[in-house]
């Protein structure tokens, strides 16, 4: 089967295409040959601006999805964490989610191994993620967190040049890129990741050959885990412009545990919620936790502590 794959042109994006399509071929039992249609996203065009200032829903996905919707590509491949919760009920649909090598964040520091609270007072930590910023300030309010955009190679170069004392990156990205650098993995129970972090999603048009081929196949075991984390984002969406984190893990074959967190942007307030249930109910559990986060954040706003 030949497919045209819309994706961003970064080295990590192309590696994710390769992983997702090779895994999808095995899953569906179909030999797939692909041609990459490279697309520049809004996030790529405005690479010098903080993500929250761009003001675009799906800053890394919108233009890529348009290539599929217009027929210029058959499927799109995204980092699941970059995908908004709306827009995939038709005409576009998430048809497959590739497994993740890790959900964890990684702290890379010029000061050596350690957790965020071990960074020296006045240290400068670079990140473009509102979640990583809030969590870092929650654990260590004595550091400075500054915006840092760019691919992983660029961020590591700026760290080596001394522009930052530490950065936080996705461990999955480090693994996929084969980066040889010393880092401290941050346990998800302590530093929960972005919902869907590490997973790679495949999007297709409803009714397309790819969507029909995958429609009735059993879902891979990590499918429900991924949807539990997205469920947190769905549930929190209505009242939450606040940083949200989520981590789901299977408990044996039939159960799942979901951890969710919301923080004020400055890290001064944080709320954790956890729940367990049957794995088929994973998405519902995630949505319920997200709604709980939303209610808590609404209370912060009423008392002037959510900003």
UniProtKB/Swiss-Prot annotation:
- Can the keyword NAD be found in this entry's annotation? no
Which pathway, metabolic or otherwise, does it act in? Answer: Porphyrin-containing compound metabolism; protoporphyrin-IX biosynthesis; coproporphyrinogen-III from 5-aminolevulinate: step 2/4
Q: Which reaction does it catalyse?
A: 4 porphobilinogen + H2O = hydroxymethylbilane + 4 NH4(+)
- Sites where S-(dipyrrolylmethanemethyl)cysteine occurs are at 240
List S-S links within the chain.
none
Cellular compartments per GO CC? cytoplasm
Q: Which EC numbers does the record give?
A: 2.5.1.61
EC class name: transferase
Kindly give the Gene3D superfamilies that the UniProt entry links to this protein.
Periplasmic binding protein-like II (3.40.190.10), Porphobilinogen deaminase, C-terminal domain (3.30.160.40)
SUPFAM superfamilies assigned to the protein according to its UniProt record, in alphabetical order = Periplasmic binding protein-like II, Porphobilinogen deaminase (hydroxymethylbilane synthase), C-terminal domain
Keywords attached to this entry: Porphyrin biosynthesis, Transferase
Q: Kindly list the cofactors needed.
A: dipyrromethane
The cofactor remark states:
Binds 1 dipyrromethane group covalently.
Please list the GO biological process terms of this entry.
protoporphyrinogen IX biosynthetic process
Q: Does the keyword Transferase apply?
A: yes
| Domain of life where this protein originates | Archaea
Query: In the record, what terms sit under GO molecular function?
Result: hydroxymethylbilane synthase activity
Other remarks on this protein: The porphobilinogen subunits are added to the dipyrromethane group.
Q: What does this protein do?
A: Tetrapolymerization of the monopyrrole PBG into the hydroxymethylbilane pre-uroporphyrinogen in several discrete steps.
Family recorded in the similarity comment: Belongs to the HMBS family.
Q: What is this protein called?
A: Probable porphobilinogen deaminase
Organism, as annotated = Aeropyrum pernix (strain ATCC 700893 / DSM 11879 / JCM 9820 / NBRC 100138 / K1)
């Amino acid at each position: 089967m030949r497919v045209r794959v819309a994706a961003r042109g970064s080295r990590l994006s192309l590696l994710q295409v390769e992983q997702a399509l090779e895994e999808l071929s095995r899953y569906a039992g179909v030999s797939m040959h692909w041609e990459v249609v490279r697309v520049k996203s809004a996030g790529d065009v405005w690479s010098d601006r903080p993500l929250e200032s761009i003001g675009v829903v799906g800053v890394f996905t919108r233009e890529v999805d348009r290539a599929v919707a217009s027929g210029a590509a058959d499927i799109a491949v995204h980092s699941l964490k970059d995908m908004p919760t709306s827009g995939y009920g038709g005409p576009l649909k998430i048809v497959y989610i590739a497994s993740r090598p890790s959900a964890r964040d990684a702290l890379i520091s010029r000061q050596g191994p350690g957790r965020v609270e071990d960074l020296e007072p006045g240290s400068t930590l670079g990140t473009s993620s509102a979640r990583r910023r809030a969590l870092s300030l929650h654990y260590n309010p004595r550091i400075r967190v500054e915006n840092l955009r760019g691919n992983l190679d660029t961020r590591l170069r700026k760290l080596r040049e001394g522009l930052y004392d530490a950065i936080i990156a996705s461990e999955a990205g480090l693994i996929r890129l084969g980066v040889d650098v010393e880092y401290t993995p941050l346990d998800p129970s302590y530093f929960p990741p972005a919902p869907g972090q590490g997973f790679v999603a495949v999007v297709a048009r409803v009714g397309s050959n790819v969507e029909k081929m995958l429609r009735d196949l059993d879902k891979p075991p990590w499918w429900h885990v991924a949807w539990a984390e997205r469920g947190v984002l769905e549930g929190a969406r209505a009242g939450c412009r606040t940083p949200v984190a989520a981590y789901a893990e299977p408990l044996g074959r039939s159960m799942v545990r979901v951890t969710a967190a919301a923080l004020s942007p400055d890290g001064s307030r944080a709320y954790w919620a956890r729940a367990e249930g049957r794995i088929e109910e994973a998405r519902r559990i995630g949505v319920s936790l997200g709604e709980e986060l939303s209610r808590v954040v609404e209370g912060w706003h009423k008392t002037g502590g959510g900003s």
